[in-house]
Amino acid sequence: MKSLLYPAIALMNRLSFGMKFSLISVLFFVPMGVTNFYLLKQAYEEFQVTRIELQGLDLLSQSFKLRQDVQSYYDLVQINAIIISSTGGRSSELDSQIAALEASIGQALQALSPASNDDEAIQIFVAKRDEMLSMLKAAKAEAVPLGKVEFVEKLQSSSLLFSKLISTQSYLAQDADVELRQLTELIIAYTPRVAALLSDARATSAAAMGQKMLDSGMAGKLDMLMGDMEKMHAEYGLALDEAVQRVPKLAEVLGSSANDSLAALKSIPELVDGQVIMAAELVAPWKDIYALIGEGVEKSYRLDAAVMDLLQSELSERLISKRNQMILLLVALSAVFLIIVYLYGAFYVSTRSSLKGLGTIMHKVAGGDMTVRFDAKSQDELGELGEVFNGSVAQIRQLIERVG
């Protein structure tokens, strides 16, 4: 064993006590400090991610409102284009609604700001937002109704992708919690598709009512939409069931919002079939069918809002928890570090004091004073050495007394 330790013993024998102590202190405190730093860094990063997710949730809510306005804008532009092409006249009410939505969408886009702190993510966000502003500007400037529809269709597709971009940049889509990812997927991947299908049915049905006839093109489109809604009903139902299974409290929190949104995929096709496809004549105002189907679309939006409220609650609780964990970790690590430094320093001072005291006593003994005694205050090996020294001095004193 001694041969194994010989290199270290040789090194220590070359160093003074202070140098030995300093070397051991460096080898102990540097790794400890690095470890504490990374523990605190990890806790802070988790706190920051949660805060960005909360900020991203507010931004996602704004993008949902934007998407709803863009969807309504797209529907009204389609209806307006078909009415103009079939009747040759314009509706001042439609024009005013479209103009109001254009102003609202423009203001909403300009108010959006990225939640991420990453420069590359900010550039991507700003580029996508500016692209949508350019699309809106082009749509507003387009005088041909069908040309306007094409621009708004691109804007509508971009609004869907924009929500996905926000969920990715704010870490909601990559969250470590499976339940939170499930909820995010529900409002990013499913409810937008449901709302888009219902909105397409709303626009096509209202346009047919507006031109007072259902031509073959519209009839074919409605048949296709009804088939898509039937498929979506099954897929959407499975997604909702899976979400409820993974997040048991989801059913209680959402209440009837999920069932209402799912039921709309059944009730709207029946409504369209009865009032548009199978109707003997289309005499009702287009606004009536638009409002009726719009109620089904609103059910999906209400589900989005309910899920967003749940996410807001979960992330707010997590943010408080992460902040408390970070503070407790900082306090605990600091306390441990300070206690170690305090005890380490006390050990150094105690050892130095014992060695100095022993040296002083030995100096007096060397001067001939055999009456001195080393007062050992420590109970360690130095204390034992002091007791041995006292015994040796006592024996020497006895020998001197015998000789005398």
Feature-to-residue mapping (PLM):
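HAMP domain helices
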Residues: 51-52, 321-404
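Hydrophobic alpha-helical segments
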Residues: 1-337, 341-352
